[in-house]
Swiss-Prot record:
Fe cation binds at residues 36, 64, 67. This is Hydrogenase maturation factor HypD1. One of its GO terms (molecular function) is iron ion binding. Keywords: 4Fe-4S, Iron, Iron-sulfur, Metal-binding. The gene is hypD1.
């Protein structure tokens, strides 16, 4: 089994769609949040919403690390990169993420800031070795999936005594964000619509396992199904959620058992726990300040913390009021509800983070809905 084409089988997908249609009750609505941006793209790419009954609604969640990074953190990174001694190492999908007042790392680079696009933490290590007289700062971002490589990088830097390497840490935690959505009525009732369940993230769950979701499912009485990214994965997860709702169950189920266990990746979690600890709170675009949702370096590794080394402090900046990215990340609105979408906000000229990132909901709508519209025009 190749674990790809088999999970895109059209006949099986149609069978799952019929099963969902047979199980849903016409007397109620079903509203499920797909937390991960990868699921949002799968739903858009394969047109899965078109296969679901009208009373089953998929709500896009804040599962895109570039999208949820607030503009203030981009501004802080730009200030770092403008220092003459600093070389800022950045993953490519961050380069166009919007800061305040139209700023971005790409624009800052064009204006002379020392910014290098990297593909892995190893690139930052090599650069620090090659430029001993400079301060190499790695812009660490992402959920639990990308945190272990950052932890390993810091331990390598300590072992090699790379005094010129530091980390601007923006790693965030998925369970904390899910908890925030469920505990906050203004967020939980997305646009006045309650949430009935979650499709849990795939890649994140390979690291953390399914156990962290269990207290939430019990406390808030909401079913959670961890699912893979293929179309059959998503459809099966929806079917599992529908059955739980119908049976008044609120359990954590693992549809993605071919990659996810209850315990997760113990070695990866150990690497992270050696280097990082919880922040008291961290700001998320769309969710505000979320308690215990971000990571920082432990005191024993504080010498590698760029925020400490360069004495940079949190900023508070307002988002573009015309952009609905914050509401989209909360699930209160969809990309097509934003008046900028497809007009002045496109992948070529993005205004909001949801259009910049390859995992953003706006990027998914733009890419796949345009493709389907074009296909429809060609066949009409």
């Amino acid at each position: 089994m190749k674990y790809s084409s088999e999970f895109r089988d059209k006949t099986i997908a149609q069978g799952l769609a019929r099963a969902i249609d047979a199980e849903v009750s016409s007397q109620r609505a079903y509203r499920f949040v797909e937390f991960c941006g990868g699921h949002t793209h799968a739903i858009s790419r394969y047109g899965l919403e078109d296969l679901l009954p009208a009373n089953v609604r998929m709500i896009h969640g804040p599962g895109c690390p570039v999208c949820v990074l607030p503009a203030s953190r981009i501004d802080m990174a730009i200030r770092l990169a403008e220092r003459p001694e600093v070389i800022l190492c950045v993953y490519g999908d961050l380069m166009r993420a919007p800061g305040s007042q139209g700023q971005s790392l790409l624009l800052a680079k064009a204006l002379g800031a020392h910014i290098r696009m990297v593909y892995s933490t190893l690139d930052a290590i090599r650069l620090a070795e090659q430029t001993p007289g400079r301060e190499v700062v790695f812009f660490a971002i992402g959920f639990e999936t990308t945190t272990p490589p950052t932890a390993v990088m810091i331990r390598i830097a300590e072992h090699k005594r790379l005094e010129g390497l530091s980390v601007f840490c923006n790693h965030v935690l998925t369970p904390s964000a899910m908890h925030r959505i469920l505990e906050n009525p203004k967020i939980r009732n997305t646009g006045g619509v309650p949430i009935d369940g979650f499709i849990g993230p795939a890649h994140v769950s390979t690291i953390v396992g399914t156990q962290p979701y269990e207290p939430m499912a019990e406390q808030f009485e909401k079913p959670i199904v961890v699912a893979g990214f293929e179309p059959l994965d998503v459809l099966q997860a929806v079917l599992m959620l529908v059955r739980q709702v119908n049976q008044n169950r609120h359990e954590v189920e693992n549809q993605y058992s071919r990659a996810v266990t209850r315990e997760g990746n113990r070695r990866a979690k150990e690497e992270v726990s050696q280097v990082f600890e919880l922040r008291e709170q961290f700001e998320w675009r769309g969710l505000g300040l979320v308690p215990n949702s971000g990571l920082k370096l432990k005191q024993s590794y504080a010498k590698f913390d760029a925020e400490t080394r360069f004495a940079i402090h949190d900023l508070r900046v307002a988002d573009n009021p015309a952009c609905e990215c914050c509401a989209i990340l909360r699930g209160a609105k969809r990309p097509i509800d934003c008046k900028l979408f497809g007009n002045i906000c496109t992948p070529e000229t993005p205004i909001g983070a949801c259009m910049v990132s390859s995992e953003g909901a706006c990027a998914a709508y733009w890419t796949y809905r345009r493709v389907r519209d074009e296909q429809a025009r060609q066949t009409s």
